[in-house]
């Protein structure tokens, strides 16, 4: 019988004042992997992936601003730059350097933007399910659905 590993639920306050929630699957000292969910996701969206990776990596699954147990954005700032600053602040707060960044959908866009501005922080980048550009009609549809 296999024992299911449970992550530690933690929060970190960034210099910007926003509190971000994340799941830490342990294994300190192993290479760090930071997982970013999609628009309608949250840190637990990565539970199955995290369980598979946590034997060999320190897996951190972040609730991005406005999602899961993280704070809503101050003044409603959900810009790409704000997400990039959150990733930078989070990685600095946890002393992550040379980490692997994995992003799905919106998290993939944020990961790609982060890599473009802070590639020196990354060892690897994995992008899952993003398109080449943002179509305004898609943004309008998502806004209506939310």
Segments predicted by a language model, with ranges:
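Glycine-rich His-Gly loop
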Residues: 35-38, 105
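Conserved catalytic-core motifs of eukaryotic protein kinase domains, centered on the activation segment
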Residues: 45-47, 70-76, 136-139
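Active-site loop/oxyanion-hole signature of alpha/beta-hydrolase fold enzymes
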Residues: 15-16, 23, 51-54, 61-102, ...
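Conserved hydrolase catalytic core segment
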Residues: 97-138
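Alpha/beta-hydrolase fold catalytic core
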Residues: 1-33, 55-57, 96-97
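Alpha/beta-hydrolase active-site loop signature
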Residues: 40, 64-68, 132
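Serine-hydrolase catalytic-loop signature spanning alpha/beta hydrolases and amidase-signature enzymes
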Residues: 38-48, 59
């Amino acid at each position: 019988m296999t024992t299911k590993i449970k992550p530690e639920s933690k929060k970190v306050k960034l210099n910007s004042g926003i509190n971000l929630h994340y799941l830490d699957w342990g294994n300190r000292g192993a290479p760090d992997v930071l997982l970013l969910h999609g628009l309608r996701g949250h840190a637990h969206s990565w539970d199955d992936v995290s369980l598979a990776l946590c034997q060999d990596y320190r897996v951190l699954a972040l609730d991005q601003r406005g999602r899961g147990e993280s704070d809503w954005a101050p003044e409603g700032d959900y810009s790409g730059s704000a997400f990039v600053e959150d990733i930078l602040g989070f990685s600095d707060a946890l002393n992550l350097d040379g980490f692997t960044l994995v992003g799905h959908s919106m998290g993939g866009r944020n990961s790609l933007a982060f890599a473009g501005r802070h590639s020196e922080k990354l060892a690897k980048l994995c992008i899952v399910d993003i398109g080449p550009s943002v179509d305004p009609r898609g943004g309008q549809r998502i806004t209506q659905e939310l």
